[in-house]
Amino acid sequence: MFKKLIDKHKKYVYHRINKMALFATIGLLGVGLVYSAKNLYTHQDNQVSIKKSFYLNKKEVRQKLIHEIDVPRILPRLKSEEEKQAESRKKYLNATITYLTEENKKAAKHTKTKKVQKTNTKRNLDKAVSKSTNAKAVKSHEVVATAYTAFCSTGCTGKTRTGYDVSNTSYYNGKRIIAVDPEVIPLYSLVQVSYEGNSFQAYAIDTGGDIKNNRIDILMDSEQEANAFGRKNVRVSW
């Protein structure tokens, strides 16, 4: 009997527990559904606000672009061909025309005559200078030429009257050396010596006791060359 009571009580407790678990499960499901619905509505509100903000910004951007397009831009206007031709005709018609009067003609003639006279004067001066130069260039003398060496039995020192050492050479700046009478041919003159179809240039940088008037002495490298030259009539130009 006690066993039956206990079994009956167990069945009652078991059914009671199952019923409570069922109610608890239903309650939890209801709470979950309510919470999910609330989150869904909140998410939809956020989506609507984002879309609204986006479309508002898009509208503002469109209005800004339309405003910029509507602003007039001032560009330089290009002139047409007719306007350019009209300006050219206007400049041509407004140009100042200068007529030659008698006074202007006289002034122009006077200026031209003065310029011609000045040019002719310059040409005459150039010709005079050229003639003077040519006259100096063709100055020449017929002289008697002999030859000498740097060392001789009468006490030659190996130097010219101007102090140039000729102990090892008979040339000065690539030209021959001659002794002259400074009263006839100035010292340091570059002269042209011509004789018997021969011609050479020489510097007059030496003098001699016997070299007077129309006499010159040509420096040679050796006594043999000096003796071979001997005595000749030559023309000296400077």
Curated annotation (Swiss-Prot):
Residues 111-121 have a biased composition (Basic residues). Residues 1-37 form the signal peptide. GO terms for cellular component: outer membrane. Residues 111-132 are annotated as: Disordered. It comes from the Bacteria. One of its GO terms (molecular function) is hydrolase activity, hydrolyzing O-glycosyl compounds. One of its GO terms (biological process) is peptidoglycan turnover. Keywords: Signal. This is SPbeta prophage-derived uncharacterized protein YorM. It comes from Bacillus subtilis (strain 168). The lineage of its organism: Bacteria, Bacillati, Bacillota, Bacilli, Bacillales.
